[in-house]
Amino acid sequence: MENISNLNKIEFISSLNKIRVESSKLLPINNSFIRFDLLNLVMLHELEGEELSFKRLYSSVNHSDIGLRNHLMKLKDDGWISINESKKDARSKIITATDKLHRTYERLSEALRKNS
């Protein structure tokens, strides 16, 4: 960040704070980077049209397997994500975003645009 002016640094940090505040209002992250990372990863793979398997998930984030699994099951139970068999490989489970998560990301996007 050496070449970035202090004003740009302030704007950048302010943007990060807005993301954190708005995300905390709308998403079930409970101040957990694990949940924040999980939800973002699920949405990213879904929007890119890629399947997110458990194997890919575990290799994509730097959190403990047990912590990830506990948060995944809670997010599933609360209707934020679904876990189904892969159409490509019946041995694999695929994590996808529910309509609830899609709608919430739309609201989050709108809130961030309003506050920028």
Regions found by a protein language model. Name each.
Residues M1-I29:
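N-terminal leader segment of winged-helix/HTH proteins
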Residues N8, R20-S23, E106-S116:
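Amphipathic alpha-helical dimerization/coiled-coil segments
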Residues L16-R20, H45, D78:
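A short secondary-structure junction motif
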Residues K25-H63:
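N-terminal helix-turn-helix DNA-binding core of bacterial DNA-binding proteins
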Residues I34, S86-S109:
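Short, cationic-aromatic polyanion-contact patches
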Residues M43, M73, D77-W80, E106, ...:
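Charged/polar positions within long, soluble alpha-helices
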Residues E51-K93:
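Canonical helix-turn-helix DNA-binding module
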